[in-house]
A protein has these predicted regions:
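FAD-site-proximal beta/loop scaffold in flavoenzymes
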Residues: 1, 5-71
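C-terminal, flexible cofactor-proximal segment of oxidoreductases
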Residues: 75-152
Length: 152
């Protein structure tokens, strides 16, 4: 099974600001999610550039799902607080983050779990089926409800 998608680009405002991002419009950050040239700039999730673990015959990006995005954001926020309070920074390497994903594929879906986002992994499994689709639908409803009612 192969899925081919068009190249993903960052937003125009970031991509077109000299020195802010790479050619594709993704922000370069370190493991504290701080920009190397702009110390007051932190970024997380889809906005950041994550280096692929190796070269492939066909250029590909690195998936940035909700779970690692949340981990990046928590690290960035903790480091903003650390900057304000003069405390040491925390670091969270993308490669070391666990992989948790419920992917919707129409009327089906997949639950994906791994001990690391990127290879090499010691443990990983994928469970396809309609249950994953319904889990995704249920989680989306819960997530939106919880945010509307300030249950974070």
């Amino acid at each position: 099974f192969t899925m081919v998608m068009p190249r993903f680009l960052g937003v125009d405002a970031v991509r077109n600001t000299p020195g802010l991002a790479n050619a594709n419009g993704f922000l370069e950050v370190d493991d504290s999610y701080q920009h190397p040239q702009y110390p007051n700039l932190y970024a997380a999730g889809v906005a950041v550039h994550v280096k692929p673990p190796g070269q492939t015959p066909v250029p590909c990006g690195v998936p940035k799902t909700g779970y690692p995005t949340e981990q990046m954001a928590k690290t960035a926020v903790r480091n903003i607080v650390a900057d304000i309070k003069g405390l040491p920074k925390q670091h969270a390497k993308f490669d070391d983050m666990s992989a948790y994903c419920i992917m919707d594929t129409g009327n089906m879906g997949m639950v994906i779990v791994g001990d690391h986002m990127l290879s090499p992994r010691e443990h990983e499994f994928i469970i396809p089926g309609p249950e994953a689709h319904w889990a995704k639908v249920a989680f989306e409803k819960y997530f939106l409800w919880s945010r509307r009612h300030a249950h974070v």
